[in-house]
């Protein structure tokens, strides 16, 4: 089964996640099919906390990909910034 989940990156005590489409059998940080964006839980000030390609996200959902609970919650509350909306 294909899933949409967070792949951890960053340094020790400084998490940074990529939102990826991957086969469920792959490891959390292993090979993935497509990168849909990122999530920075420690974003401060003007830093972007979440960037997500909603067109690609919705396309994968239509194809049958299952989002994780955390990704589903992030996508539900996602509002693109003005830069992303005009691009």
Swiss-Prot record:
SUPFAM superfamilies: Ribosomal protein S16. PANTHER family: 30S RIBOSOMAL PROTEIN S16 (PTHR12919), SMALL RIBOSOMAL SUBUNIT PROTEIN BS16M (PTHR12919:SF20). Gene3D superfamilies: 3.30.1320.10. Belongs to the bacterial ribosomal protein bS16 family. It comes from the Bacteria. The gene is rpsP. The keyword Ribosomal protein applies. GO terms for biological process: translation. Keywords: Ribonucleoprotein, Ribosomal protein. It holds the Pfam family Ribosomal_S16. This is Small ribosomal subunit protein bS16. GO terms for molecular function: structural constituent of ribosome. One of its GO terms (cellular component) is cytoplasm.
């Amino acid at each position: 089964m294909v899933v949409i989940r967070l792949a951890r990156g960053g340094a020790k005590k400084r998490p940074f996640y990529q939102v990826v489409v991957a086969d469920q059998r792959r490891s959390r940080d292993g090979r993935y099919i497509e990168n849909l964006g990122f999530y920075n839980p420690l974003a401060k000030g003007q830093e972007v906390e979440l960037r997500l390609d909603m067109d690609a996200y919705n396309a994968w959902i239509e194809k049958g990909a299952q989002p994780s609970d955390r990704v589903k919650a992030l996508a539900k509350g996602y509002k693109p910034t003005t830069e992303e909306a005009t691009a």
